[in-house]
C-alpha cells in the first residue's frame, strides 16, 4: 500500500509545481501590461504638457510682439506730433519775425520821409514855399513813391505822369506847380552834391535817377559839375536785394562777377560787405601768410641772438670773477 501511494504523491507535487509556474507567469504578464500602460499614459501626459507649454510660449511671444508694435507706433506718433508742433512753432516764429521786419521797415521808411519833409523846411528859404500851403508840402513825400505807377502812354511819351504831380496840375495851380518844381530841384541839387561826395569816396559806378524830367529842362541846369560829363543811365526796374522799385539814388555794384543794381541803402551795405571780403582775402592771402611767416622767423632769430648775447655776457662775467678770485 505504501509503495503504491508514492507515485501519486509525486504526481501531485508535479501538478502543484505547474500551477505555481502558471501563476507566476500570469503575475509577470499582468505586471508587464500594467507598467507598459502606465508608461504610455505618462508619455501622453508629458506630450500634452509640452504642447500646452509651447502654446503658452507662443501666446506670450505674440502678446509681447503686439505690445512692442503698439509701443513703437505710439512713440512714432508722438514723435511725428512733436515734429509737427515744432515745425508749426518755427513757421509761426518765422511769420512773426517777417511781420516784425516788415513793420520795422515801414517804420524806418516813414521816419525817413518825415525827416525829409522836416529837412526841406531847413534847407529851402521860406520865401520859396509861397503857394505850397494847403497840404501840398506833403505831396513831396509821394513823388518818389509814385514813380513806379507813372504811365508811359501820352503824346509826349515823357515820364511826367506821377500821380502827385497830376493831382496838382489838375487843380490848375500854376504858382504852386512852379514852386513845387523849384523846391524839388533845389532838394535834388543838395542830394546830388552829397551823393557825389560818396561817389568820389569809393562808390563803385553808382548813378542817380531823380524821377521825372521837367519840360523846361530845369533838372539838367541843376546837375552838379561833377556829373555833367557822365551820360544819364536808365532807371533799374527794382533793387536786386530788397526788390524796391523806387529810389532817389541807384548803385551798380559787381557781385560774384555780375553787375547788379541796388538802391542807395542796399548799395552801401553791399559795398561795405565787398570791402570786408576784400580785406579778408588780402589778410588770408598766400603772400600775406608768407610775410607773416617771415616776420615770425625774423623775430625768432632776433630772440635767439639776444639769448646768445646774454649767455656770452654771463660767461664773460664768470671768467672775470674767476680771474679776480685767483
Swiss-Prot record:
GO terms for molecular function: sequence-specific DNA binding; zinc ion binding. Keywords: Metal-binding, Zinc, Zinc-finger. One of its GO terms (biological process) is regulation of DNA-templated transcription. The keyword Zinc applies. PROSITE patterns: GATA_ZN_FINGER_1, GATA_ZN_FINGER_2. Residues 165-189 have a biased composition (Polar residues). Gene3D superfamilies: Erythroid Transcription Factor GATA-1, subunit A. Residues 193-218, 294-326 have a biased composition (Acidic residues). Residues 1-102, 145-238, 277-326 are annotated as: Disordered. Residues 17-102, 148-164 have a biased composition (Low complexity). Disulfide bonds: none annotated. A zinc finger (GATA-type) spans 239-266. This is GATA zinc finger domain-containing protein 21. It comes from Dictyostelium discoideum (Social amoeba).
Amino acid at each position: 500500500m505504501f509503495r503504491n501511494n508514492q507515485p501519486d504523491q509525486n504526481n501531485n507535487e508535479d501538478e502543484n509545481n505547474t500551477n505555481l509556474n502558471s501563476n507566476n507567469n500570469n503575475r509577470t504578464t499582468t505586471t508587464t501590461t500594467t507598467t507598459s500602460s502606465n508608461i504610455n499614459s505618462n508619455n501622453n501626459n508629458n506630450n500634452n504638457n509640452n504642447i500646452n507649454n509651447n502654446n503658452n510660449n507662443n501666446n506670450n511671444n505674440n502678446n509681447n510682439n503686439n505690445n512692442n508694435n503698439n509701443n513703437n507706433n505710439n512713440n512714432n506718433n508722438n514723435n511725428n506730433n512733436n515734429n509737427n508742433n515744432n515745425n508749426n512753432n518755427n513757421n509761426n516764429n518765422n511769420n512773426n519775425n517777417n511781420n516784425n521786419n516788415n513793420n520795422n521797415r515801414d517804420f524806418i521808411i516813414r521816419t525817413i520821409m518825415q525827416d525829409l519833409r522836416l529837412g526841406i523846411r531847413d534847407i529851402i528859404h521860406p520865401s520859396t514855399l509861397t503857394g505850397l500851403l494847403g497840404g501840398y508840402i506833403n505831396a513831396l513825400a509821394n513823388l518818389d513813391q509814385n514813380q513806379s505807377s507813372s504811365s508811359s502812354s501820352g503824346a509826349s511819351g515823357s515820364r511826367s505822369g506821377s500821380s502827385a504831380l497830376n493831382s496838382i496840375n489838375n487843380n490848375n495851380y500854376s504858382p504852386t506847380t512852379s514852386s513845387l518844381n523849384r523846391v524839388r530841384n533845389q532838394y535834388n541839387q543838395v542830394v546830388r552834391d552829397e551823393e557825389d561826395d560818396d561817389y568820389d569816396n569809393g562808390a563803385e559806378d553808382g548813378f542817380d535817377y531823380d524821377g521825372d524830367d521837367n519840360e523846361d529842362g530845369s533838372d539838367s541846369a541843376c546837375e552838379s559839375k561833377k556829373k555833367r560829363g557822365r551820360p544819364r543811365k536808365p532807371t533799374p526796374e527794382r533793387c536786386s536785394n530788397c526788390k524796391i522799385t523806387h529810389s532817389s539814388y541807384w548803385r551798380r555794384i559787381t557781385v560774384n562777377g555780375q553787375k547788379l543794381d541796388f538802391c542807395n541803402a542796399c548799395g552801401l551795405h553791399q559795398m561795405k560787405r565787398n570791402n570786408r571780403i576784400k580785406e579778408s582775402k588780402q589778410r588770408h592771402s598766400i603772400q600775406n601768410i608768407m610775410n607773416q611767416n617771415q616776420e615770425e622767423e625774423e623775430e625768432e632769430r632776433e630772440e635767439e641772438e639776444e639769448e646768445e648775447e646774454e649767455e656770452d655776457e654771463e660767461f664773460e662775467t664768470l671768467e672775470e670773477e674767476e680771474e679776480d678770485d685767483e
